[in-house]
Structure formats: structure tokens, C-alpha cells
Amino acid sequence: MTDYAKFEEIDLTVEEVLNCSFSKWAPLFPKNVFPYKIIAPLPDGFIDYVQSDGIKLPSAKTNKIVLEQNSDNEYSDWEDVEDIENDTGEVEEMHSESQKNYEEKEVLEASGHFPQLNQEITQSIAELGGKVIPKLNWSSPKDASWLMPGNVIKCTEVDDVLLLLKSSDHVIDDLAYPFLEVSQLPEDETRKNGQDRIKVDYELVLKQWRDLNPALEFRVFVKEGKILGISQRDLNHYDFLKELEPQLKENIQLFVTDKVVNKLNASLPNLTKFIVDVYVPRPFDKIYIIDINPFLRKSDSLLFTWNELLTADPDSDTVPFRLINETNVGAFAKKQYSESQVPLDVIGAAQDHEALIELAKEWEKLQSKEAEEEDEAVVVDGVIEEK
């Protein structure tokens, strides 16, 4: 017989979500956060740009993106070149003119829309040592790290920052549905077309990039001033953590209870529950705050389930401290944020049998077309030409 657990509601308020914005809590812990810059408020046009389809970046080098001529984007002026191929000069002139027209059509000028903001970002990056990690009020674009060299969200120029923001599902979700899990919105702030009408002053946070050891990052769940659980943040097995567990657990508990909770209670009394990510570098005598997030289900509960956290006894003398060990490493052996690296067509097909069949048919057609094109190609004097 299957045991069913009651779905536990999270009584989350708008104010609690807003108080987890970086600019609300970071200034309270000047000695426990890495150097950062906040650019705020962000103009509405920039928010629309981040949420818009397509990616247009203000390249610092050329301010343009040019698509090369190929079979997928043929330009009409290239037609009938064979009819005048004997006139080399005319062909070259036609090629030059058509290429110029083509480039003018495809040049994408994005920097002109937000020149001041781009300048602020560039200046902030320089002041922070030339390497930064971007984020908005709540989420950082970790799910888009696969677009960056080394799979690391380390930005050295404006283009890097914008690429990550526009490619991140986490960032887009924060912009479109920041209060989706709020239990009760104010009466005059009901949702319209699925989006919240509450005005949010969005901010761009640039944090100085540090090469952190992921094994020493931990997530702490706090409710009503009590720690419900502590979880390893990176879901890989590290042998050395087991012997450090008592020391790490004690240090994290003391820091969160004595410093984080007390400071937030004094400055942000309405923030009664939250999730704090901490970094505990060797020699373990100082702890840094990476982020403070709203206490909601879209935040990863890692080695806990949300039902465990919501039904935990806050007055218990024992705080669960969970690590990936040799026996449970397989349970979490998946690529993190892999769902953000798959085309929407594939995700939709996985949930719809008919869509899956249609996707398979389209893929088969594409494969057949490519095979036919390869069969029609011949090699003449070392050059591939069409038959």
C-alpha cells in the first residue's frame, strides 16, 4: 500500500520575496559577502529586452553580428551569377554590392538602446577586477553556464552578461513570475494574464568572481528563526567532507543562528523564512554568504524533500546535515540544469505522444534531405560541386 503525504502549503508573502532581493540583505553583511556592484533600477526597456525572443548583443569589438551566406539564408541577389560568370569584374562588383546589402540587413545594433547601462556594466566589471558573476534580484543564470567557456558564469564584458541573462530560464522566471508561489497577493494586485502586477524595482548585481571550491558550499533552510536542515550544495561525492562534518555543521549553525538570523530579525523583521547559501573555505574560521533566497518550492531542496522541510520540528535539538555519500551518489547522478539545455520542441514532445511522433517524422525528413544532398555532391579537381 502506498503511503501518501499531505501537501504542505508555504505561507509566503510578497514582502518576504522582496526582502530577499540582493540589495536588501547584502549591505547588512559587509564582511561576509564578496565585493559587488549594484546597478539599479533597471529601465523597463532593458527588462523587455531580456525577456524578448532572440539574442542581440552589443559587441564591444564591432557592435555587429553578420550572418554568412549559405544555403539556409540565400539572398536573391546571388541568383543568376552563372549567366555572367565570364565577366569577372561584373561578377565581383555584383558580389561586393550584394554582400554589402546583406550585411546592412543583418547588422544588429543593440548597444544603442542602453548605452549608459552598458557603460555602467563595463565600468563595474573593471572595478571588480575584470571578472564578475551577474544576477538580478534573486537568481543567477547558472542554468545558462553551458554557453560560457569552461561551463562557468564568469563574465569579462557586457556581451557575456547579456548573453547569460537572456539565455537563463531562472532569470526569465524571476522577471515574469516573481510572486507565483505567494500564498495571498494584495487585493488590488491580482494576477493578469498569468503575470504579477506588483511593481518590482529590478536590479543588476555584479559580484566579483571567485574560484570557489564547490565542495564547501552549503544550503541552509531557515523558518521562524530555526534551522530546519543543512545540505551539501554540489551534488557530487567528496571523501574529505565526512571527517569535516562535525566542524562544518557547528560553524554553519553558529553563523546562521547568531549572525544571519539575528541581523535579519533586526533589520528585516518580516523575513521569517528564507534559504541561505554559504561558503566555508579553509581553514573554516570565516563563512561567506553566497545568496539568500525566498523560502519557496522553485528553490532546489537538494538532499531534502520539501515535505521533510515543511513537516520538520523546528524545536528539535538535532539539525539534519546531509552530504552525498558513496551509497547515494547514484541517486543524484544527473547533469545539473540539463532541462534548460534542451529545445522546447523536445520538452513538449516528451509530454505529448502525438508531438513526439511528429518530431520523429520531422527529424527523419531532415536526415533524408541531408543524405540526398550528400549523394548529389561530386568532387571536381578537389572541390565539392553540386551535380
Curated annotation (Swiss-Prot):
- List positions binding Mg(2+): 291, 293
What's a BP term from Gene Ontology annotated to this protein?
eukaryotic translation initiation factor 2 complex assembly
- GO: which molecular function terms? ATP binding; magnesium ion binding; protein folding chaperone
Keyword Transmembrane helix appears in the UniProt entry: no
Give compartment(s): Cytoplasm
Keywords of the record: ATP-binding, Chaperone, Cytoplasm, Magnesium, Metal-binding, Nucleotide-binding
What is an example of a Pfam family matching this protein?
D123
Q: Which InterPro entries match?
A: CDC123
Answer yes or no on keyword Nucleotide-binding. yes
Name any GO cellular component annotation.
Answer: cytoplasm
The entry marks the following residues as binding ATP, namely: 135, 138, 140, 142, 207, 209, 217, 219, 233, 277, 291, 293
Function noted in UniProt: ATP-dependent protein-folding chaperone for the eIF2 complex. Binds to the gamma subunit of the eIF2 complex which allows the subunit to assemble with the alpha and beta subunits.
Family indicated by similarity: Belongs to the CDC123 family.
The protein here is known as Translation initiation factor eIF2 assembly protein
Q: Which organism is it from?
A: Lodderomyces elongisporus (strain ATCC 11503 / CBS 2605 / JCM 1781 / NBRC 1676 / NRRL YB-4239) (Yeast)
